[in-house]
């Protein structure tokens, strides 16, 4: 099940639903995974962490799937979703089996199940929590964007060495020459090779 939630079809579904492109699942389930709460347990209203410090990713989406067979209303445990100003509860979601809740993670996406569970002993509120992230374009400030860098091995024939030099030269051109001018340079190179 966890594999499915981290799969490409799931990521594409979430991207289509949320219009957030480039979603990345968390293979480590930091803060996520299988959650279980017993009688008297609760989770106060809160806004989640937004940076995965291990992977340096921006958290964007929460997905919660409930695993509670025969859940009764008197048990409580409803997920509450609050407005940005914490003035009004916008939605209350019972944790029924196979119910899936998907919502954005931002600085004021307040949620939780703040009332103590009233379950019989041995009855647990169970869920799977999954978080989805995006990478930041700020990485380009720290790491230059280059494509694969080719080198010939010592002893490679002249054609292989020439090809590797040309590929490296093209890489340097892409870093420093505007795209319109680069097309012109490549056109000249093609003519010279004839």
Question: What would you call each of these model-derived segments?
Answer:
Residues 17-19, 44-51:
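Short acidic (Asp/Glu) patches
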Residues 1-4, 61-64, 72:
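Short N-terminal signal/transit or membrane-insertion segments
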Residues 38-44:
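Active-site-proximal inter-transmembrane loops
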Residues 22-26, 32, 36, 59, ...:
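Acidic, glycine-rich loop-and-strand cores that form catalytic or ligand-binding grooves
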